[in-house]
């Protein structure tokens, strides 16, 4: 059940928050500790809410006697639910239950620490509560996934949410985790808890269609420069797929735990971005021919616990070049970089009868890639010395690239759309192909791997157009 947290602080602001949310949600958590309202005004707010939860977070300066009196007075307002913190005296909770048997009790714990929620639940379940809520901290994606895994072994009357920015995916996955309550803020209001989404955000991630049977798709790696969550979720919604696409920041050091965890979670597909495209290879159960050829993997397909790696980067860029009618036969093509994406692109173009030149900051890495693609290797500083018909930049925006021009320049970075490198090339008359074009083509290839039985040709133009618009919003060079 989607629940909007009402924080006011004034009566008028609280009323607006409720009225603004009524079409999207019917349950409202009144954070009485944040509201500056009278008892009569609180009653009026409750009358507006079809379902009400009253919660009052105990200040450190509050005595236990005053705390008990406060919660008893809130119970007398007859809410549908009353949230009592973990340390609220058990005997006083029982007294409230006896006096107000119609009220459902939520026993809650909020902590900024990473906690074993199974042990916590074992300790708290002796309490005569109807529901249990655990709001805990996660310091990493693997922590988050571990907590989600723990939640799946708890009864359906438990709500588990991870706080902060790292915990945001747990809020999106709430229906899949079978949380009885999913807490959100009214659209336009400030978050009450760290990482709290607005109602609008939850519906953007297809909240209404998600259930315990829904699969999960995600992006792993350095997710900071991706627009995938902004393009993929609307696409899945249009496709009628009850599946969220979430961003999971991940480092190479976290890969062993990540791969052991996703086998126990309902993951269907994973996009892999830098710096993990080669690091994931040892953890794959199967490698598609595209991965064996390039030595790079940007796509995971998970079926029945088996993880198969695919590579759609090279084919995605090749498709873009064909759409722009860029000649490759007997042409000299410069590839800047030697990482996963560069490997994929070089491998694909090595079959296009063109001469490949690999330029990289570390020349040894360029030489290694060149030896596998019948190419020539150079240091990055040598780029301006060579005349080529096409330059493909695969280095991140933070890298300084020597000024160079060619009839056509490709930058595979999606955001920012413009870089110092492409701006200079454009000023010298080069035709520029921006990263969002490769992004959409490689993503469409991923979708075909994840949803092989679905047809979505009719949605591709809208998907491509959306990516182009979003890339333009992040168009300023660093």
UniProtKB/Swiss-Prot annotation:
SUPFAM superfamilies xrefs: Aldolase, Aminoacid dehydrogenase-like, N-terminal domain, NAD(P)-binding Rossmann-fold domains
Set out the biological process GO terms recorded for this chain's protein.
3,4-dihydroxybenzoate biosynthetic process; amino acid biosynthetic process; aromatic amino acid family biosynthetic process; chorismate biosynthetic process; shikimate metabolic process
Q: Which NCBIfam families does the entry mention?
A: aroE, PRK09310.1
Which pathway does it take part in? Metabolic intermediate biosynthesis; chorismate biosynthesis; chorismate from D-erythrose 4-phosphate and phosphoenolpyruvate: step 3/7; Metabolic intermediate biosynthesis; chorismate biosynthesis; chorismate from D-erythrose 4-phosphate and phosphoenolpyruvate: step 4/7
Ligand binding (3-dehydroquinate): 21, 29-31, 55-57, 171, 196
User: What chemistry does it catalyse, as a reaction equation?
Assistant: 3-dehydroquinate = 3-dehydroshikimate + H2O; shikimate + NADP(+) = 3-dehydroshikimate + NADPH + H(+)
**Where do the record's region annotations for Shikimate 5-dehydrogenase lie?**
209-478
**What does the record give as EC number?**
4.2.1.10, 1.1.1.25
Entry similarity comment: In the N-terminal section; belongs to the type-I 3-dehydroquinase family.
Q: Where does shikimate bind?
A: 226-228, 298, 313, 442
Give any GO molecular function from the UniProt entry.
shikimate 3-dehydrogenase (NADP+) activity
Gene3D superfamilies assigned: Aldolase class I, Leucine Dehydrogenase, chain A, domain 1, NAD(P)-binding Rossmann-like Domain
Keywords attached to this Swiss-Prot or TrEMBL record, sorted alphabetically, are: Amino-acid biosynthesis, Aromatic amino acid biosynthesis, Lyase, Multifunctional enzyme, NADP, Oxidoreductase, Schiff base
Chain intervals for the UniProt region annotation (3-dehydroquinate dehydratase): 1-208
Which InterPro entries does the entry link to? Aldolase_TIM, Aminoacid_DH-like_N_sf, DHquinase_I, NAD(P)-bd_dom_sf, Shikimate_DH, Shikimate_DH-bd_N, Shikm_DH/Glu-tRNA_Rdtase, Type-I_3-dehydroquinase
Protein's name in the database: Shikimate biosynthesis protein AroDE
Entry annotated with the keyword Amino-acid biosynthesis: yes
Instruction: Specify the domain of life of the species encoding this protein.
Output: Bacteria
Q: Which function does this protein serve? A: Bifunctional enzyme that catalyzes two sequential steps of the aromatic amino acids biosynthetic pathway. In the first reaction, the AroD domain catalyzes the cis-dehydration of 3-dehydroquinate (DHQ) and introduces the first double bond of the aromatic ring to yield 3-dehydroshikimate; in the second reaction, the AroE domain catalyzes the reversible NADPH linked reduction of 3-dehydroshikimate (DHSA) to yield shikimate (SA).
The active site of this protein is located at 110, 133, 277
Decide whether keyword Amino-acid biosynthesis is in the record: yes
Q: Which organism is it from?
A: Chlamydia trachomatis serovar D (strain ATCC VR-885 / DSM 19411 / UW-3/Cx)
Quote the record's binding site residues for NADP(+). 337-341, 360-362, 435
Lineage start? Bacteria, Pseudomonadati, Chlamydiota, Chlamydiia, Chlamydiales
**Annotated disulfide bonds:** none
